[in-house]
Amino acid sequence: MRLKLILYFLILSCYLGIGSARAATLMHGVANTWNSFSDNVSQTWNDPQTFDLYVPAVTWHNRWTYDSDKIDKYNERPWGAGGGISHYDEKGNWNGIYLMAFKDSFNKWEPIGGYGWEKTWRPLADPDFHLGLGYTAGVTMRDNWNYIPIPVLLPLASIGYGSATFQMTYIPGTYNNGNVYFAWLRWQF
């Protein structure tokens, strides 16, 4: 009996030790990610390389996830405007801080502001052509949610030439809610 208790104690100690090492590794990874994120935001804010104009271009409600009577009522022309600042890091990746307002699906004003990051590729011999893939983290407010601030974390993709970039995201959702492709033009000055 005593031997079994000692074995259980040793096994539990080893298991907890491994768990502690995994937890420490996870916490280290989270801390590194947060430090990288906050450093990028700070550098973009303190050392912008360009000023940006944002012009919303298209909103598309995924036809496979909406009833046609809902789609017929929605606005898919999100006119509006916004501004921001951009910084390209030492790896050539885009970092941006932005604020934009546009007409949402219900034709009501929706502001959004935040930080965006994209890994940038220049796959052609022409260095002006670029592709990007990344994320945006920010806050938006909608009329149908009484303009309560809503945090957002969304994917970003882009294609551009020189100072003009067509940037886009997809807002996931459920049936008749979310599942919206949203795109805008971004000009850097």
From Swiss-Prot:
One Pfam family hit: PagP
Catalytic reactions on record: a lipid A + a 1,2-diacyl-sn-glycero-3-phosphocholine = a hepta-acyl lipid A + a 2-acyl-sn-glycero-3-phosphocholine; a lipid IVA + a 1,2-diacyl-sn-glycero-3-phosphocholine = a lipid IVB + a 2-acyl-sn-glycero-3-phosphocholine; a lipid IIA + a 1,2-diacyl-sn-glycero-3-phosphocholine = a lipid IIB + a 2-acyl-sn-glycero-3-phosphocholine
Residues the record marks as site: Role in lipopolysaccharide recognition: K70
Cell compartments where the protein resides: Cell outer membrane
Stretch forming the signal peptide: 1-23
Taxonomic superkingdom: Bacteria
Keywords: Acyltransferase, Cell outer membrane, Membrane, Signal, Transferase
Active site: H61, D104, S105
EC number(s) from the headed UniProt entry: 2.3.1.251
Keyword Mitochondrion recorded: no
Annotated positions for site Role in the phospholipid gating: Y175
Cellular-component GO terms for this entry: cell outer membrane
Cystine connections: none
One Gene Ontology biological process: lipid A biosynthetic process
Family to which the UniProt record says this protein belongs: Belongs to the lipid A palmitoyltransferase family.
Database matches in NCBIfam families: PRK11045.1
Name this polypeptide is given: Lipid A acyltransferase PagP
